[in-house]
Amino acid sequence: MSPTAGENILLKAEALSVYYGNSLAVKDVYLEVLKNKIVAFIGPSGCGKSTILRCFNRMNDLINGCRVQGRITFHDQEINDGRVDAVELRSRIGMVFQKPNPFPKSIYENIAYGARINGYQGDMDELVEKSLRQAALWDEVKDKLKDSGLALSGGQQQRLCIARTVAVQPEVILMDEPCSALDPISTLAIEELMQTLKEQYTIIIVTHNMQQASRTSDYTAFFNARATEGGGKMGYLVEFDTTEKIFDSPDQEATADYVSGRFG
């Protein structure tokens, strides 16, 4: 079941399937993402969570042999329409990856570089400060903006990547296991940051951490996978609903088994 709220639907996937070559990786996904909400994608490894996440800003275009069937709409516009520029789409739907990946540049330039490429004409110092504040990093780095972003701790690097993402003023932030390489304190900082960010942005997060999904998200999509001929896996969406519903009274037995730790 997908939540619906009329004009608040920002992203929608309909009959979405993804192939790698001739192999069907994820089949027939339907879901809706509401504005200023956090949606968590959960499920065992190989069920297609990250594959579906990358569909929303066409990162899968960069994977040789990957093709998408079905529809994804953003503000009711089909994003795979030939008239949609993928680079512009990615500025509106940004991404934070599993491993922090700051540019080999100064902290300042990590923020300014993308904004400059995207044609930002305003006060760059102001944008850098605003972005770092939004990522709850400003107070820690304000006196060392000329230092390399690579010199920061892992948690700080991930927040720098979030600051870099928000600097280009996206509407949606995709997060692919953003805390998997971080310690518990840094993870908590990112989770607290997400609650602040959702006031301005819509967030979709892939996570293997059930507690993180239940703590941070408004809606949860549970994916699973079944074995295919040749030893592969095909992912599919089992259930999508409010996080409270998914964790407390899911409709599907497989969902209940997964969130309770009985498999996965």
UniProtKB/Swiss-Prot annotation:
Binding site for ATP: 43-50
GO cellular component, one term: plasma membrane
GO biological process: phosphate ion transmembrane transport
Catalytic activity: phosphate(out) + ATP + H2O = ADP + 2 phosphate(in) + H(+)
Record EC number: 7.3.2.1
ABC transporter domain location: 11-250
Keywords of the record: ATP-binding, Cell inner membrane, Cell membrane, Membrane, Nucleotide-binding, Phosphate transport, Translocase, Transport
Protein name: Phosphate import ATP-binding protein PstB
Family according to the record: Belongs to the ABC transporter superfamily. Phosphate importer (TC 3.A.1.7) family.
Subcellular location: Cell inner membrane
Function statement: Part of the ABC transporter complex PstSACB involved in phosphate import. Responsible for energy coupling to the transport system.
UniProt membrane topology term: Peripheral membrane protein
Self-association and partners: The complex is composed of two ATP-binding proteins (PstB), two transmembrane proteins (PstC and PstA) and a solute-binding protein (PstS).
Species the sequence originates in: Synechococcus sp. (strain ATCC 27144 / PCC 6301 / SAUG 1402/1)
GO molecular function, one term: ATP hydrolysis activity
Keyword ATP-binding among record annotations: yes
Organism lineage: Bacteria, Bacillati, Cyanobacteriota, Cyanophyceae, Synechococcales
Enzyme class: translocase
Main location: membrane
InterPro entries: AAA+_ATPase, ABC_transporter-like_ATP-bd, ABC_transporter-like_CS, P-loop_NTPase, PstB-like
PROSITE patterns with a match to the protein in the record: ABC_TRANSPORTER_1, ABC_TRANSPORTER_2, PSTB
